[in-house]
């Protein structure tokens, strides 16, 4: 099964928001009123973006909490598909939509 290219929420936060806006992790954590370790762990890839963090990021950057949660959700799903790809291929699909579950088809939504 082909591996998916997976854009990480941490990479988007770092490269698309913090670097261009010249915002440090420290400044972001202070402005969001959260521990600095939370942002640091997200940037390192050791922590997921929670609903709480998503709401705070959306208020700060002027986008929606769903933007951040969907980034995290898509990342998590793609990781699981890649991790379970061999198992998924062995599962026989029941019903009319044979082999709907694949990297190619799941990535379309």
What positions do the PLM features span?
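Short alpha-helical DNA-recognition segment
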Residues: 22-41
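Short, charged recognition helix plus adjacent turn
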Residues: 69-109
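The alpha-helix within a helix-turn-helix
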Residues: 18, 29, 58
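Short, basic-rich loop-to-helix N-cap that marks the start of a DNA-contacting helix
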Residues: 46-59
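The DNA-recognition helices of helix-turn-helix-type DNA-binding domains
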Residues: 35, 46, 61, 72-75
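A short, Lys/Arg-rich alpha-helix, primarily the initiator
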Residues: 1-23, 107-109
């Amino acid at each position: 099964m082909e591996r998916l290219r997976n854009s990480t929420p941490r990479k988007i936060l770092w490269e698309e928001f913090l670097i261009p806006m010249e915002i440090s992790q420290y400044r972001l954590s202070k402005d969001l009123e959260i521990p600095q370790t939370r942002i640091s762990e997200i940037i390192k890839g050791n922590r997921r973006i929670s609903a709480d963090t998503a709401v705070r990021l959306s208020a700060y950057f002027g986008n929606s909490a769903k933007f951040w949660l969907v980034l995290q959700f898509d990342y998590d799903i793609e990781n699981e598909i890649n991790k379970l790809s061999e198992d998924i291929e062995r599962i026989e699909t029941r019903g009319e939509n044979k082999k709907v579950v694949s990297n190619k088809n799941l990535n379309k939504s």
